[in-house]
Amino acid sequence: MDATYEGDLGAAAGVPFRVGRESKAEFGEPGAGRTYEYWKSLPASGSTGESDNAVQAYNYRLCLTNDPDNRILFPKPASYNRNEYVSLIEDVWTGKNTQRAMLKVTGEMMEENRRHIAGGNQTKLPGDSWGIRKLSSIVKLPNQKTDGNNQHAAFISTDLPEENWPWPTSSWEWRDKFAKRLKDYTLGLFWFAQNDPELPEHFRKAMLEWGLAKDEYQDNEYFPRQVYVREGRRFEGVYFFTAKDALPTAPGKRPPLHGSSVTASHYALDSHAARKREAGRVHLDGFISYPTAVYTVPLGVILPRNVDNLLLPVPVSGSHIG
């Protein structure tokens, strides 16, 4: 059994696989190929639907806390590069974000927001967030902790697009180097948000309320060990799962029902960004989310076509969107 994202065993066994994004033309899937959308799911200019070798971004899921007695402030990594984070400055001052509410936002509204913040206030721009929520999604956990994930409405957060593209087929030496790079990038982002003098002082103070939980990952500098690898190799199996398997066949109907189903789900079809910020775009390339109805997943997605005695329950047979 190969229950890894990377699928190294499946590849060694000679099972054909895919890496990257299919074109929209191949399976007719929403959000396939190169695509730009406001968060959530409002198409914008620049989308081509073309296939490429882009892999959606990875990050670390952080255990954060605002409990002063259990908080470790983010250290400044030795490889810190301020230039990686400076775009956050204008985003904080103007309130610029990737929500569909930005459709009605004018340049004057963003300048008014800048003046509003300069007066010691928090942002008032539609769709914007302040403090830790500008950089990270916050899901509450017990003991005054949170699961900190990438902030989908931001241009810069804990995801590190593009640099992870080689991960699925690379050696573990390369993967370990990227994991260290991603850790340093993440720590640098939060250190910047807590300390850079060009950010509003009250924004920095709000950020300083948060840190890593000091009773978690104590043997790893309070930092998660595992990169959140959202997608790696996708093998070609007895059944190839696409978006059409998770979307209703018609209004008021349900998705196709698979008689060989081994599980059911209702999670959205979603992807994180595949590219870094680009001038003039309303969001990062590839950031999409589409609601589904309850759908079934057939056994064939974990059975390789041409190899016996092998199951692939994580690097399954399916498209990028599927």
Give, region by region, the residue ranges found by the protein language model:
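Flavin (FAD/FMN)-binding glycine-rich loop and adjacent Rossmann-like elements that form
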Residues: 3-321
